[in-house]
A protein has these predicted regions:
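Hydrophobic h-region of N-terminal signal peptides that target proteins for export
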Residues: 16-22
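C-terminal segment of N-terminal export signals and the immediately downstream linker at the start
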Residues: 23-33
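A structural signal for alpha-helix termini and helix-coil/disorder junctions
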Residues: 207, 373, 440-444
Length: 444
């Protein structure tokens, strides 16, 4: 593994021109795919070597991979080539999106409003996984979402109850949305729809390669959902947490009944997504293979985006404490830990590509340092995935808002300002930080 990654970096160093044309895909198509990633105690392993993740979030990979008006396979190839050039070996992608009435949901989805599956987008997923495999990379494949931007649990509930709630609806202030969405775990009909969809994806055969997903080593992990929470209020969590744990355990069992080769993960934020409860974290990760933590200092009020200089010190201390808490929990549970989402705004909370990102760079290096320190001390942290890769995409609108019909997909989901957290291909300081860390992990 270490030789492959080092030689890939060296071999690609002089090949930047092919990125502009998408021509690197064939160059890397002959790379040997990794063995199935597995868990041994607190380690993720590939063969007899630890598998350390230097990764990115790229939720939109299947959309680019679709042979459809909204797809752009040439761009997908260029973006994956850029990530490979940086030394990254893992991407986290969405394999679920449910069409429905929620105003912030991406369209098209994998599951159409009438419940039928979208063959074009499924083909896009096939293509994305095949392209990831060509580059010797792996994917975390996410099968659902607690949040509304891809439809998610709220849409499954809507399909069986006829009722829904938009996030940030003034008529339903926080935490009404997470409490309402957590009702999913106790609704047998909604869970049945989710399970049916999970079966369709996990048991799928890639239409382009003829390989069953269950037999494809390019898939590192099936992930139950993006950031599933047990609720938002004391009462909501108390009401839903037992059904929540049961849903996790049953879903992990379902996936393993369909696929004996791949890891299963939850996609959890950590204690911030568990109403501060370490006990919920322990229970939630009992039946999955590794822990995840997501770290969002601005969203959680730990820093002020308009005054990062004055709020950085206190905020970064909370970040370090959060990382340490989850490393301790992973050690206690004897399981690996991945910091699979972390994001930070640019200086002044602006959105434009190439603009200063002094504190974002400092933040990324804080996360990366924690990964590297854990490695040196034989700890459980096996890597990270930054949120998120924007690459060559650029917004077409002065207000940086995504509009229906826009096709320049970014790591910033459509309901958020385009450029808020994502890393563009000309963010040189950020690319250097990401590449430095990938290099540090490249030799075992």
């Amino acid at each position: 593994v270490k030789t492959d990654r080092r030689s890939a970096l060296a071999g690609l160093a002089g090949s930047l021109t092919c990125i502009a044309t998408g021509g690197c895909s064939e160059l890397m198509a002959s790379e040997t795919a990794p063995t199935f990633i597995r868990r041994e105690g607190i380690r993720l392993m590939s063969g007899d070597m630890p598998y350390r993740i230097a990764g990115a979030n790229m939720w939109y990979a299947a959309w680019l991979g679709a042979d459809a008006e909204y797809g752009n396979r040439a761009r997908l190839g260029r973006e994956l080539d850029r990530l490979k050039q940086l030394g990254l070996n893992n991407v986290r992608i969405m394999a679920a999106a449910e069409e429905g009435p929620l105003k912030n949901s991406i369209s098209p989805g994998f599951s159409k409003a009438d419940g039928s599956l979208n063959p074009e987008l499924l083909g896009g997923l096939d293509y994305a996984i095949a392209e990831i495999a060509k580059r010797g990379m792996t994917a975390v494949v996410c099968l659902g979402n607690f949040w509304e931007w891809s439809g998610g649990f709220g849409t499954w509930l809507y399909r069986v109850t006829g009722q829904y709630m938009d996030m940030n609806d003034p008529a339903h202030p926080w935490p009404a949305y997470p409490d309402a969405t957590a009702a999913f775990y106790g609704n047998a009909e909604a869970i049945a729809l989710y399970r049916e969809y999970v079966r369709a994806i996990v048991a799928r055969t890639n239409s382009l390669t003829g390989q069953a997903y269950a037999d494809d080593p390019a898939i590192m992990s099936w992930q139950l959902a993006n950031e599933p929470r047990p609720g938002g209020s004391d009462a909501g969590v108390a009401s839903h947490q037992d059904a929540y744990i049961q849903w996790i355990d049953d879903s992990a069992e379902l996936i393993r009944s369909l696929d004996a080769h791949h890891l299963v993960s939850l996609g959890h934020e950590g204690t911030q997504g568990a109403h501060g409860s370490e006990d919920i974290i322990r229970r939630a990760h009992a039946k999955v293979d590794y822990l995840t933590a997501h770290i969002w200092p601005l969203n959680w009020g730990w820093v002020d985006g308009k005054d990062l200089a004055e709020t950085w010190d206190a905020g970064s201390e909370k970040v370090r404490d959060y990382l340490a808490t989850h490393e301790r929990l992973a050690t206690e549970l004897n399981k690996p830990l991945v910091f699979e989402e972390f994001g930070f705004p640019r200086d002044g909370e602006v959105y434009s590509p190439g603009t200063p990102s002094t504190f974002r760079e400092r933040y990324y290096r804080t996360i990366y340092n924690a990964v590297e320190v854990s490695r040196r001390s034989n700890g459980p942290v096996m890597g990270s995935n930054f949120w998120a890769w924007n690459g060559e995409a650029r917004t077409a609108h002065a207000d940086a808002r995504f509009r229906q019909g826009d096709l320049a997909y970014m790591g910033d989901p459509p309901h958020e300002p385009q450029g808020w957290y994502g890393v563009f291909d000309n963010d040189d300081a950020m690319l250097a930080a990401i590449g430095d860390h990938a290099n540090a992990l490249a030799v075992e």
